[in-house]
């Protein structure tokens, strides 16, 4: 129980008209620490109690009695709580030194499954920065949900089916060079894809030819299938190399093609339930009662199925396979209408578990304010970007610590971590402009800044040869220490907020605040000097390092011991 929960609990025992949850939402942190650590505004009670808020605040302050508070005073309409810094710091440091990286572990999920649909790049196209967001947000959410007691299933729903394969087959047959593709598969396939899209703008017959080849693919044509399988295999080799660089793993690579033989069953269920309507030769599901104007297009007039049919099949398969408590789709916000339709159709089919499905949208990555597009060849490829980030990180590490032994390994952790952290610190629904120089900077709100704060603490602990004692009597009551203690104590609540909002940026911003608070503490406090507080200061440094490393881990970012 953190201090806000303690205060809410104490207040709820003497306030009849508000429960603990309602009180918790009303608690504030005063801007001026001289007004206390936490404040409760009494305005909301005035109507019920038929008293002035000032009088209510005074009465509540008088009734409060807990060893956790140094004092409780009424200031106008507010009840201001001054916490016992020594007692709380002792409690927090004891918890972290005992639990170490398991500090803030929770069992909210009771080991139920969370399925995370994430990354999902398109086969035969290079892995670009555009795919990064879904990959790193999904990976971070997996760590966050595991931290609070869920098991996670990470699904890479590969874009390995669709008309684009018709386009690619046509392009390869017209202009492809087998040896060139074998030597540099993704580069060559991208050139072919960009070329056919450019030429199709002036030659509509190419579109028709592509549609015909895709129909052949759907009908099991031997040549079409062989080319498709080749494109898929070559792409997966490249993708897996990049996933290894990012240290991201998956539990399933079942992509769009996996559901080819599962869509007829969906159409049959919809038909049996009388949900399919005829519209201009196509089959649709009307969703007007859900406030959705456009019906869900299940089957086109030529008999071809659509994304939603495939996603319905995937949803049914995943529920049956994993019995999920939550199923989340980390997909760009431009797909919001699609996921509203998906949930509504599942509801129409009578599946209550459609409520457990959540679309987790995110904003676009731009370059100099311009939208990126693989089709137009305006793209930032991830592999050379990682190489450049690692190179920039290494230059800075060599300048700061030329004697460092494992420079290449550390530079890789810092370079990759910088790209991930910059993405994850951005509020998910906002986009950001890609700026590698800003990402890899050791100054400002960046991954390297947080990693460097962690490495600095490890250096202090090595110099002191500090090993925390679980029975250690650590406590501090100075202002700089208190700022850090409050943050560490808040870590479990921060994790819960990140999970509730599917928002890793809450963790990233917390990590920045904790690193900044420690750096300020380090600048004002002689941690290693002999003094009665030395062990407690070292315990605080240790606890900060534990929580920083764990916060970075929840973001999928490594924390090097030396930098």
UniProtKB/Swiss-Prot annotation:
A motif ('HIGH' region) lies at residues 121-131. The keyword Nuclease does not apply. InterPro entries: Arg-tRNA-ligase (IPR001278), Arg-tRNA-synth_N (IPR005148), Arg-tRNA-synth_N_sf (IPR036695), ArgRS_core (IPR035684), DALR_anticod-bd (IPR008909), Rossmann-like_a/b/a_fold (IPR014729), tRNAsynth_Ia_anticodon-bd (IPR009080). Pfam families: Arg_tRNA_synt_N, DALR_1, tRNA-synt_1d. The keyword Hydrolase does not apply. Its EC number is 6.1.1.19. GO terms for molecular function: arginine-tRNA ligase activity; ATP binding. It is found in: Cytoplasm. Its main location: cytoplasm. One of its GO terms (biological process) is arginyl-tRNA aminoacylation. Keywords: Aminoacyl-tRNA synthetase, ATP-binding, Cytoplasm, Ligase, Nucleotide-binding, Protein biosynthesis. It catalyses: tRNA(Arg) + L-arginine + ATP = L-arginyl-tRNA(Arg) + AMP + diphosphate. One of its GO terms (cellular component) is cytoplasm. Belongs to the class-I aminoacyl-tRNA synthetase family. HAMAP family: Arg_tRNA_synth. Monomer. This is Arginine--tRNA ligase. It comes from Streptococcus pneumoniae (strain CGSP14).
């Amino acid at each position: 129980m953190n201090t806000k929960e303690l205060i809410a609990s104490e207040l709820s025992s003497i306030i009849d008209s508000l429960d603990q949850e309602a009180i918790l939402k009303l608690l504030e942190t005063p801007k001026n620490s001289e007004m206390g650590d936490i404040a409760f505004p009494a305005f909301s009670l005035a109507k019920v109690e038929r008293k002035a808020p000032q009088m209510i605040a005074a009465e509540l302050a008088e009734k409060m009695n807990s060893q956790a508070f140094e004092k409780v005073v009424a200031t106008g309409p507010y009840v201001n709580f001054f916490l016992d810094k020594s007692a709380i710091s002792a409690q927090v440091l004891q918890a972290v030194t005992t639990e170490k990286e398991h500090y803030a572990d929770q069992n909210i999920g009771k080991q139920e499954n969370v399925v995370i649909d994430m990354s999902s790049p398109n086969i035969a196209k290079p892995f670009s920065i555009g795919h990064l967001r879904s990959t790193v947000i999904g990976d971070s959410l997996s760590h966050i949900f595991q931290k609070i007691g869920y098991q996670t299933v990470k699904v890479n729903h590969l874009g390995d089916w669709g008309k684009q394969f018709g386009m690619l087959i046509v392009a390869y047959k017209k202009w492809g060079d087998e040896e060139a593709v074998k030597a540099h598969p993704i580069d060559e396939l991208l050139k072919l894809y960009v070329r056919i899209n450019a030429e199709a703008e002036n030659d509509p017959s190419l579109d028709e030819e592509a549609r015909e080849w895709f129909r052949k693919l759907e009908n099991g044509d031997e040549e079409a299938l062989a080319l498709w399988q080749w494109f898929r295999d070559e792409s997966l080799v490249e993708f897996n190399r990049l996933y290894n660089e990012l240290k991201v793993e998956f539990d399933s690579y079942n992509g769009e093609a996996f559901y080819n033989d599962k869509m007829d069953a969906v159409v049959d269920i919809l038909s049996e339930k009388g949900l399919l309507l005829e519209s201009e030769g196509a089959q649709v599901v009307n969703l007007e009662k859900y406030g959705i104007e456009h019906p869900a297009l299940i089957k086109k007039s030529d008999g071809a199925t659509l994304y939603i049919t495939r996603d319905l099949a995937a949803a049914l398969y995943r529920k049956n396979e994993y019995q999920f408590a939550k199923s989340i789709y980390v997909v760009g916000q431009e797909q919001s209408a699609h996921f509203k339709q998906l949930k509504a159709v599942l509801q129409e089919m009578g599946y209550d578990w459609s409520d457990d499905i959540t679309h987790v949208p995110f904003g676009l990555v731009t370059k100099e304010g311009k939208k990126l597009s693989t089709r137009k060849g305006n793209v930032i490829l991830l592999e050379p970007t990682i190489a450049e980030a690692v190179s920039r990180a290494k230059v800075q590490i060599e300048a700061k610590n030329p004697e460092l032994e494992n420079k290449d390994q550390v530079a890789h952790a810092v370079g990759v971590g910088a790209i991930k952290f910059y993405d994850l610190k951005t509020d998910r629904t906002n986009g950001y402009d890609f700026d590698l120089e800003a990402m890899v900077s050791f100054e400002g709100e960046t991954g390297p800044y947080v990693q460097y704060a962690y490495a600095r603490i490890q250096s202090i602990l090595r110099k002191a040869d500090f090993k925390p004692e679980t029975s250690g009597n650590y406590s501090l009551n100075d202002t700089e220490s208190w700022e850090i203690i409050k943050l560490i104590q808040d870590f479990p609540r921060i994790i819960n907020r990140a999970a509730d909002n599917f928002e890793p940026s809450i963790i990233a911003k917390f990590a920045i605040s904790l690193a900044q608070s420690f750096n300020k503490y380090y600048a004002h406090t002689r941690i290693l000097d002999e003094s009665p507080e030395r062990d407690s200061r070292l315990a605080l440094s240790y606890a900060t390092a534990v929580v920083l490393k764990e916060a970075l881990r929840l973001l999928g970012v490594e924390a090097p011991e030396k930098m």
